[in-house]
Amino acid sequence: MSQIAVRTFHDIRAALLARRELALLDVREEDPFAQAHPLFATNLPLSRLELEIHARVPRRDTPITVYDDGEGLAPVAAQRLLDLGYSDVALLDGGLSGWRNAGGELFRDVNVPSKAFGELVEAERHTPSLAAEEVQALLDARADAVILDARRFDEYQTMSIPGGISVPGAELVLRVAELAPDPRTRVIVNCAGRTRSIIGTQSLLNAGIPNPVAALRNGTIGWTLAGQQLEHGQTRRFGAISQDTRKAAAQRARAVADRAGVERLDLAGLAQWQDEHDRTTYLLDVRTPEEYEAGHLPGSRSTPGGQLVQETDHVASVRGARLVLVDDDGVRANMSASWLAQMGWQVAVLDGLSDADFSERGAWSAPLPRQPRADTIDPTTLADWLGEPGTRVLAFTASANYAKRHIPGAAGVLRSQLKQALERLGTAERYVLTCGSSLLARFAVAEVQALSGKPVFLLDGGTSAWVAAGLPTEDGESLLASPRIDRYRRPYEGTDNPREAMQGYLDWELGLVEQLGRDGTHGFFVI
């Protein structure tokens, strides 16, 4: 293993304050990451490093600092990054404990920069809000009001406010005039907790729509804590809009972006930015996934604007990088960019595009390193092998997916916990690795071979191919060989969270502005 450099808390803090590019990678699984991490740390688990690193940290000489909390994952991740061609890789001195001991502030939960920024917006702009009981009274009185749900459509389908319509955050300014054409209609924006409803409401206010606007205070959590009933399985969505509506919304959005200092680029300017190899530039299409798949700018990534503002660290993992946003009408890109600029990003909107520029079709595919060689078998062969003793199937898939469906007898394993899982499972004569498609499993073949000393095979096409072949599956966690730490249980997701967890989450959000002040590196401003 190479000798790996070390960076200190003070090195990272100085770079953040100077707005120099850096990637601070927490390579633990998501749940331990969510318990405590620095503000601008981004979670990229060792388990999925090869699958995500090239998209999230595209420039190979980006200063990358890796840490864990003493689990031994960081040195492995740092060496793996060097092997993948990254040249400026260091370990955080002392790991998470070193950060804490040096006086660094630690935050819990996920997507904290975005959530803390939302709280700062409300604190500075006094974004109007209504309590759950007030909104229920409006519904009971059949008041002239419309409820717009700013979350992803799948979240909306899980649970929603009665009568609410799914309008993900970046779509609000574009579509509100058709959903509430009478300027006397009250517009209420909700999410699950606080951030997206605050940002959505303030977006409409910043854009100067004539309607009265308010956030549903504390979202579906507040609704539940008030003892009020949610709807489930709803499908109400925004519809088509007129060209006049689109044009008026574009004018409003551009004015907001200009106030926030958003830059402008044409295709020539974009090419110039992309040719500057000492800077990282992300090219992000902020329209709906359906629009992206129907036609997009080559080289762009699909990142719907509302989620980009909410989960910036999941996409742009290099703090200090440049963001270029793309749409086909100037509304969603400008509104999203206005928020990202206030969050301290250098951000530009790509202007002057024609329909012909959106020439590439299909879903976005993550850039990947060269895939390692592996001996493969087909599902029928595996089924035959499982009829005899000695074959152990290891499923390298998300624990939630494993619990829903897996090959009978397969053990659910996290790569970051592989050694412990193999010890727990005992020896086998041979191993067959799988996941949904076998892509992630392919990167684990050499590790299993090194740890077990046994023959290791890859299931061609993964568990999806097994299912497509009509072979049986089972559910449950009886053979989950790694702890369920790959997914942090968010108190605002699902319908069965304890009241104490939901209230605790709201209390935590309300304390974020104070934490931002103690940390002192955020660089946020509010227009």
Segments the model singles out, each with a brief description of its role:
Residues 1-23, 27-146, 150-282, 286-392, ...:
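Rhodanese-like catalytic fold shared by cysteine-dependent sulfurtransferases
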